[in-house]
Curated annotation (Swiss-Prot):
Membrane topology field: Multi-pass membrane protein
GO biological process assignments: protein secretion by the type IV secretion system
Protein name: Conjugal transfer protein TrbL
Transmembrane domains' residue ranges: 9-29, 59-79, 93-113, 162-182, 183-203, 209-229, 255-275, 302-322, 329-349
UniProt keyword terms in alphabetical order: Cell membrane, Conjugation, Membrane, Plasmid, Transmembrane, Transmembrane helix
Predominant subcellular localization, coarse grouping: membrane
Species, as recorded: Rhizobium radiobacter (Agrobacterium tumefaciens)
Length: 395
């Protein structure tokens, strides 16, 4: 008996091949979209610069007048001499003049600080969200050379390469999204924070104006750290993809690239805010938070690995049964692939449905854990019994 492969499975593999071939130009255009978004934010922010600056100047001179008036009242109450009046006048003129200069040049100074730190992080080169996204596309394009499906090809390596490509593109897309968010914070924060410079007209509120300059330095540090992390991560991944071990140990290198891209994303998400909080004198996060989320990502990867192993075992069993029934080698291989991929997809879909409807025993496990249990049940292996439902002590 000859077992023919499923037409749906053949169509799926053909579709995947076309998507892999056509995805590079489309994804490359996404970098231009990020650049356009950044330029749009800059243009929109500049439209508010005059309005915010006029409001800050009005607030500054109102507070400066109040400051001079209070000083004059205290001098009159204390019956100060002419020398005291002259000394107080000089002191107030120097104070108001200094903060008036900061108000007039504060935005330019803040942008200069941020740009200088930004260039330090870029290492003298160019860095932008589009460049970060393009770096992920270059790594994925390099790995697409290993995604070759066929009867005489290493299909396990091809599946791992496709999986790693998806992980790399998603991770660098998220890093680019973080970059865009920080850039928006920089433009909007520095512009809206100009109103704080208007509070420098009084000695009682001058600390707010100083905090604006501290904020500018903290945003620059955040950008510098993010650019450094993105450039170092992309260089490491490109080096791994082009290293000699990429051809001798292809499977291990492919999985390592996928794992490192996730690590780069987690570091880019948590380390820059920590540096920003360090400059501002407040801790906004810790290393344990990054470790916790990294552990969650590792648990998800481990669950996906076990699910892949279970699907492979199911496919091998189906292929062996088909071969024993008289199927050809190609037919048995396709039947095994159909059983493995179809079983894994069905298990994940069933687990997602149980999590969505809140089935008994689904509340305490992850979706991948439930999918592994369902795949074991389909294969006839005993699975772990579901935990008991939570006890409601409230009557």
């Amino acid at each position: 008996m000859v077992v023919h492969p499923s037409p749906k499975l053949e169509l799926a593999f053909v579709t995947i091949g076309f998507v892999l071939l056509a995805s590079s130009p489309a994804l490359a255009q996404q970098g231009q979209v990020l650049t356009t978004l950044e330029n749009s934010v800059v243009t929109a922010a500049k439209g508010w610069e005059t309005t915010v600056m006029n409001a800050a100047r009005s607030l500054f001179w109102i507070l400066a007048g109040i400051e001079v008036g209070i000083a004059a009242v205290w001098l009159a109450i204390n019956a100060a001499s002419l020398d005291s009046w002259f000394a107080e006048l000089v002191k107030r003129i120097m104070f108001i003049g200094l903060f008036a200069f900061i108000l007039d040049r504060g935005l330019e100074f803040a942008k200069a600080v941020v740009d200088s730190l930004y260039q330090i992080g870029a290492g003298g080169g160019s860095a932008s969200p589009a460049n970060i996204f393009d770096a992920g596309i270059r790594v994925a394009t390099k790995m697409s050379e290993q995604a070759k499906f066929g009867l005489w090809e290493d299909n396990a390596l091809a599946i791992a390469a496709v999986f790693a490509m998806v992980v790399v593109v998603v991770s660098f897309s998220l890093v680019a999204a973080i970059f865009v968010a920080v850039m928006v914070e920089m433009y909007v924060g520095l512009l809206a924070g100009m109103i704080m410079l208007g509070l420098g007209g009084s000695s009682y509120t001058k600390d707010f104006a100083v905090k604006y300059l501290v904020y500018a330095f903290s945003v620059g540090m955040k950008l510098m750290a993010l650019v450094m992390i993105a450039r170092i991560g992309s260089d490491i991944l490109l080096g791994l993809a082009e290293a000699p071990t990429a051809t001798s140990e292809q499977f291990i290198t492919t999985l390592a690239i996928a794992g490192i891209s996730v690590v780069v994303f987690v570091i880019a998400m948590y380390v820059p805010p920590i540096l920003q909080g360090l400059v501002q004198g407040a801790s906004v996060g810790g290393g344990m938070e990054a470790i916790r989320h990294g552990g969650q990502a590792a648990s998800a990867a481990l669950g996906a690995g076990f699910l892949t192993i279970g699907a492979a075992n199911r496919g091998f069993a189906a292929a062996s049964a088909a071969r024993a029934g008289g199927a050809s080698l190609a037919g048995a291989a396709m039947r095994g692939l159909e059983a493995g991929v179809g079983g894994a997809a069905g298990a994940v879909g069933s687990a997602a449905k149980d999590k969505a409807i809140g089935s008994p025993g689904a509340y305490a496990g992850s979706m991948l854990g439930l999918a592994n249990a369902k795949l074991d049940q389909q294969s006839g292996r005993p699975g772990t019994p579901p935990p008991p439902p939570p006890i409601n002590d409230k009557k």
